[in-house]
């Protein structure tokens, strides 16, 4: 890093810049949340009987005698993480099928009943030792769902008696994972968790980041594409934070709870290794596009790696991870100049004109997220020229623009709550004389018609209608349901509920008014799982007709 003649210019004139007084107390992170956000890039590892089945959900068809990953080497896994620049590994110790990769007496469906290392192997133990030896942080994914035991999303059993029995199993599994393998820095409950585990987390992992469930300290971004919408605010209301199923879409700059976002994403098309995935390895450009839209929007990117049936991460995948890490360093390892400061303007003079095309800005989030709008300007030909603008800065904002030669660079905060605290304001020349011809294309939302209503299928009195979402919601994400009238009055919608495996998923559907029109935001946390919508509706008049449409929310 070359810091050249950094000059902090604080312009306090209220006529020039607007610094609002916050009507609410700003949410602030715990030291552990702030440290977690500083990691920026972490690595997921998905490995389960699905790996032997060429499937993404364990169908329980693989004999345990067939699971023998003879070349499994957790040192290689850590090597891949280090080469990629990841600061933490999150290991899927038990996915939704229920197979356990550690020595546990809570189930017969696990590594103890495989031929690997004579049934004595313990992947969790090996990985913990490898990570702790190398200074790599470690997190664990423990699915509350358990297909082998017939347990649904979030740990839901079919009867009260079965629920009580499973609660004991899940609590014991969590206790083992958090007490036997050293410090766990992150705990994943995919699909939330209705099993009471708050006491266990408080006892064994009081400083860990918790993904989903009522004890959550971080939030799912709301897709599995590695894309954080912009702006993604770090705060949200305590009600949404405690729902257990919050997403980045719930962010609110004036919220009272700090809930930073995590973007889980795949390096191939799916989460588990499969022969069908062999041609789908993402390019470095695709991964960098993901990086810009996750880390560059203030989120943490959790990028998956998929060991094959030998237990090793394939060499092609390992190489791509290293190339990705190298490209991040090439672009952002050294700034041309940088500074820090407080107030409505931060400026630096590099001492001579320099060509730049990227700026990284970071707030001191320990004091809360204060910036609401900003402009970045360069002094070009003796005049200040706007290079880019935005709203949220938060932990990190990466801005890119056409290469331009500037004599000075300035950050102007045009709207804020309380005095802005800029931790870092840095300029880069990434492209040199060869800027890219086009940016990575954004993922487009596709709207589909789910259902038509009229007097032929909906009466004038309240009725219940069930709609199968399986073909419409194949990917995990937040889906938007809208009822669009084509004749007569609007359909009278009393309730919309999400059903999975016979269970109503509380808080997975949120009604919101958008431009005066009701929308229903549906949270699908597990891809490939059958879901239904249960509607309570009636016609306001016989001539009413229309359609229900659905699309996955991208922005």
Predicted regions and their residues:
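Short, surface-exposed beta-strand/strand-loop-strand elements in extracellular ectodomains
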Residues: 369-381, 490-501, 548-553
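Edge beta-strands of jelly-roll/beta-sandwich modules across compartments, strongly enriched
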Residues: 417-432, 489-494, 543-549
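N-terminal signal peptide c-region/cleavage motif recognized by signal peptidases
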Residues: 13-14
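Extended extracellular/luminal ectodomain segments enriched in beta-structured repeat modules
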Residues: 351-358, 406-407, 473-480, 528-534
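Short beta-strands within extracellular/lumenal beta-sheet-rich domains
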Residues: 341-352, 395-396, 460-471, 514-525, ...
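Mature catalytic domains of secreted/periplasmic carbohydrate-active enzymes
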Residues: 19-403, 412-444
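Short beta-strand-plus-loop segments that form exposed binding edges in beta-rich domains
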Residues: 412-418, 482-488, 537-543
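Sec-dependent signal peptide recognition
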Residues: 1-7
């Amino acid at each position: 890093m070359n810091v050249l003649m950094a000059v902090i210019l604080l312009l306090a004139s209220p006529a020039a810049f607007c610094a609002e007084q916050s009507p609410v107390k700003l949410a602030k992170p715990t030291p552990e949340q702030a440290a977690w956000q500083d990691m920026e890039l972490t690595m997921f590892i998905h490995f389960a009987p699905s790996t032997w089945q060429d499937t993404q959900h364990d169908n329980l068809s693989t004999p345990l005698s067939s699971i023998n990953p003879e070349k499994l080497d957790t040192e290689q896994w850590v090597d891949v993480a280090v080469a990629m620049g990841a600061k933490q590994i999150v290991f899927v110790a038990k996915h939704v099928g229920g197979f356990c990769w550690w020595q546990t007496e809570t189930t017969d469906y696990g590594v103890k009943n495989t031929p690997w290392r004579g049934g004595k192997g313990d992947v969790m133990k090996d990985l913990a030792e490898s990570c702790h030896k190398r200074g790599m942080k470690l997190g664990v994914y423990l699915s509350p769902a358990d297909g082998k035991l017939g347990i649904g999303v979030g740990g839901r059993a079919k009867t009260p008696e079965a629920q009580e029995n499973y609660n004991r199993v899940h609590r014991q599994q969590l206790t083992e994972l958090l007490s036997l393998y050293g410090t766990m820095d992150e705990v994943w409950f995919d699909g939330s968790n209705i099993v009471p585990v708050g006491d266990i987390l408080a006892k064994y992992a009081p400083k860990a980041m918790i993904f989903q469930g009522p004890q959550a300290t971080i939030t799912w971004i709301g897709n599995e594409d590695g894309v954080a919408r912009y702006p993604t605010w770090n705060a949200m209301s305590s009600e949404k934070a405690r729902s257990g199923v919050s997403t980045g879409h719930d962010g609110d700059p004036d919220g009272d709870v700090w809930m930073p976002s995590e973007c889980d994403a795949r390096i191939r098309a799916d989460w588990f290794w499969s022969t069908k995935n062999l041609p789908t390895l993402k390019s470095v450009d695709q991964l960098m596009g993901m990086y810009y839209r996750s880390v560059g929007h203030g989120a943490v990117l959790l990028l998956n790696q998929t060991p094959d049936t030998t237990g090793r991460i394939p060499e092609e995948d390992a190489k791509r991870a290293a190339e990705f890490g190298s490209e991040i360093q090439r672009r952002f390892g050294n700034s041309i100049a940088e500074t820090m400061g407080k107030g409505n303007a931060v400026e630096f003079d590099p001492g001579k004109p320099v060509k730049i095309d990227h700026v990284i800005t970071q707030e001191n989030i320990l004091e809360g997220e204060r910036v609401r709008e900003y402009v970045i300007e360069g002094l070009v030909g003796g005049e200040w020229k706007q290079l880019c603008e935005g709203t949220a800065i938060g932990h990190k904002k990466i801005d890119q623009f056409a290469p331009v030669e500037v004599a000075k660079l300035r950050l102007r905060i045009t709207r804020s709550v309380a005095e802005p605290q800029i931790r870092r304001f840095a300029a880069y020349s990434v492209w040199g004389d060869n800027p890219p011809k086009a940016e990575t294309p954004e993922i487009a939302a596709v709207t589909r018609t789910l259902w038509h209503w009229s007097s032929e299928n909906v009466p004038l009195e309240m009725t219940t209608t069930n709609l199968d979402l399986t073909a419409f919601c194949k990917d995990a994400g937040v889906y938007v349901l809208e009822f669009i009238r084509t004749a007569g009055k609007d359909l009278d919608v009393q309730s919309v509920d999400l059903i999975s495996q016979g269970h109503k998923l509380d808080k997975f559907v949120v009604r919101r008014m958008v431009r005066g029109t009701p929308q229903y935001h549906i949270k699908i946390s597990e891809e490939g799982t059958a879901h239904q919508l249960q509607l309570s509706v009636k016609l306001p008049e016989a001539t009413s007709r229309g359609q229900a449409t659905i699309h996955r929310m991208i922005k």
